[in-house]
């Protein structure tokens, strides 16, 4: 467990996964083991969304890739590369064509192994400041590699009626619950605020959109995404790809209200 701290905040990171962000004694992150989701955060890469209706195949310029929901990056392990009192860096490296074991097999998937026809290096860094937690993503790889990126943090809810503020509109928890597994789309948006017992704002650079998901009342996932996957058929998911130009950088800033 990597622990970052300053005078009023503590961050807990377990093998690259953000499992705690406590400010003045208030925990903002969903606790693993609580109802709702078995994780606390994950990255969705190089695809976002499910592909079971597409035979677990995604079109790329180098042919079809075998993928599963939210991509194969989440099935790989992070290596810790740097750590200080207030910062930490983690890396995943992938070599084209390498088989990655799929934890969804055999219960939820027919695919035992996932592959991708491109090399890449994926870096996730955390920086705890006096007013926020910055999470940066840096993707390095082959020129022209297609990809999507989503960040999937889960926030702990402390009250019965939290409100999500986005693009000047209020979104109630019941609205997120009603959408179910598809996730509620918030398009053309770079900042979302969750108003609960305390409030926290999720500011982003590079993503451009969000989606919100939960199936319980004690947590909600507010996810910055480069593409909303449910806008297209699963067989057309490649329409949402960006193309890598050597390096791509994305930023998420979690800013607790004062």
Predicted regions and their residues:
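Surface-exposed acidic/polar loop and edge beta-strand patches at domain peripheries
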Residues: 1-132, 145, 156, 160-258
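Asparagine-centered strand-capping/turn motif at beta-strand->loop junctions
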Residues: 137-143
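Short, hydrophobic/aromatic alpha-helical segments in well-folded domains
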Residues: 121-122, 136, 150
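Surface-exposed beta-strand/loop patches in extracellular or lumenal glycoproteins
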Residues: 149-155
């Amino acid at each position: 467990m990597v622990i970052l701290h300053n005078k009023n905040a503590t961050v807990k990171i377990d093998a690259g996964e953000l499992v705690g962000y406590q400010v003045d004694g208030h925990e903002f992150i969903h606790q693993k083991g609580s109802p709702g989701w078995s994780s606390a955060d994950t990255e969705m890469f190089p695809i976002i969304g499910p592909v079971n209706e597409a035979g677990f195949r995604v079109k790329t310029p180098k042919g079809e890739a075998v993928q599963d929901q939210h991509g194969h990056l989440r099935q790989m392990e992070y290596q810790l590369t740097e750590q200080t009192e207030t910062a930490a860096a983690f890396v995943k490296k992938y070599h084209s064509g390498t088989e990655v074991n799929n934890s969804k097999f055999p219960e939820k998937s027919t695919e035992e192994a996932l592959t991708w026809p491109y090399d890449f290096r994926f870096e996730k860094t955390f920086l705890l400041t006096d007013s926020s937690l910055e999470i940066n993503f840096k993707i390095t790889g082959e020129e022209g590699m297609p990809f999507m990126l989503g960040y999937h943090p889960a926030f702990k809810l402390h009250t019965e009626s939290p409100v999500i503020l986005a693009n000047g509109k209020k979104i109630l928890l019941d609205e997120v619950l009603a959408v179910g597994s598809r996730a509620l789309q918030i398009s053309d948006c770079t900042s979302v605020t969750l108003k609960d017992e305390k409030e926290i704002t999720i500011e982003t650079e590079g993503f451009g959109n969000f989606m919100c998901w939960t199936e319980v009342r004690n947590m909600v996932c507010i996810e910055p995404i480069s593409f909303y996957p449910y806008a297209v058929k699963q067989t057309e998911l490649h329409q949402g790809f960006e193309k890598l130009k050597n390096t791509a950088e994305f930023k998420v800033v979690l800013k607790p209200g004062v």
